[in-house]
Amino acid sequence: MNKTITALAILMASFAANASVLPETPVPFKSGTGAIDNDTVYIGLGSAGTAWYKLETQAKDKKWTALAAFPGGPRDQATSAFIDGNLYVFGGIGKNSEGLTQVFNDVHKYNPKTNSWVKLISHAPMGMAGHVTFVHNGKAYVTGGVNQNIFNGYFEDLNEAGKDSTAVDKINAHYFDKKAEDYFFNKFLLSFDPSTQQWSYAGESPWYGTAGAAVVNKGDKTWLINGEAKPGLRTDAVFELDFTGNNLKWNRLAPVSSPDGVAGGFAGISNDSLIFAGGAGFKGSRENYQNGKNYAHEGLKKSYSTDIHLWHNGKWDKSGELSQGRAYGVSLPWNNSLLIIGGETAGGKAVTDSVLISVKDNKVTVQN
């Protein structure tokens, strides 16, 4: 294994000497969202504020082009999906009209032909932040994410506390010192039909909801990898949603990034190989939680994973490394590979570069 990773490091270095995967993003980019339509990549929100950009990946002179600004204000943790030529943006965390941080449950649609946005008369039955979105048979599916009432209440309390550090410490201790099930992360699967702009119940996880999971789908199968089980506590769980036939089946696969797990990781598929890379977490938090410490990440430093794992023969194998740990960027399918755009590294620093992870014969190639 060490020889393999050493060889990969040499490959990474050789790629670094060549042209970068994509031009640097116009601003350091993290906690945003993105989608790809044919060969055009779209990214926006997060550290980009209300800005959106597109890039034609097959153009001779690749460059990011600014699009119409998002009308719903700056958002973190929104998700997006392309359906029938339009870009849909779901929820996120931002400021309301009173300047208070909140979780949104709204939907916006962007029309690339007119470079224009419209807010739809449609609201999900629950807040959407930390959720994942994927497309299947012309519908968008949403699952996971924080509980809107609990999350909004936390920020209302912080707003009232203002600069009173004693009150803030008390609020944080109260917020984080609960068991995972007491946060009521969303375990329902919702479907959104663009033709009717209606939300429907599509099922629910037999286990628990997560926030900040990585998601990837191919054909009738979708995978949800890791994420938070509660604020500050990750899970190493991997869930598979199988739409084959008339009944949706939920399967639980072998864990990855054990024992602590990560959130904000990246998932993709290359030559039928399922890839999971990066993510951020708190080493030791799982042990703390199992020992009865609900505020499991208290005093721990967030770490950023460089690991690249492949799903092979019913288990995960560490098969390579990123040049640096990163999380909370955008992962997209491109050129039969996993494309990672932006993200944050140690200390929460937003980055502007992109990474391409490809797999052939169970060997990983990383291009920066």
UniProtKB/Swiss-Prot annotation:
Active site: E228
GO-annotated cellular components: periplasmic space
Catalytic activity: N-acetyl-alpha-neuraminate = N-acetyl-beta-neuraminate
Chief location bin: periplasm
Stretch forming the signal peptide: 1-19
Kelch repeat placement: 40-84, 86-137, 139-173, 174-219, 222-265, 287-336, 338-367
Molecular functions per Gene Ontology: racemase and epimerase activity, acting on carbohydrates and derivatives
KW Isomerase (keyword) present: yes
Swiss-Prot/TrEMBL keywords: Carbohydrate metabolism, Isomerase, Kelch repeat, Periplasm, Repeat, Signal
UniProt subcellular location: Periplasm
EC number: 5.1.3.24
Complexes and interactors: Homodimer.
Family statement: Belongs to the NanM family.
Listed HAMAP family: NanM (MF_01195)
Function: Converts alpha-N-acetylneuranimic acid (Neu5Ac) to the beta-anomer, accelerating the equilibrium between the alpha- and beta-anomers. Probably facilitates sialidase-negative bacteria to compete successfully for limited amounts of extracellular Neu5Ac, which is likely taken up in the beta-anomer. In addition, the rapid removal of sialic acid from solution might be advantageous to the bacterium to damp down host responses.
Name this polypeptide is given: N-acetylneuraminate epimerase
Organism of derivation: Escherichia coli O157:H7
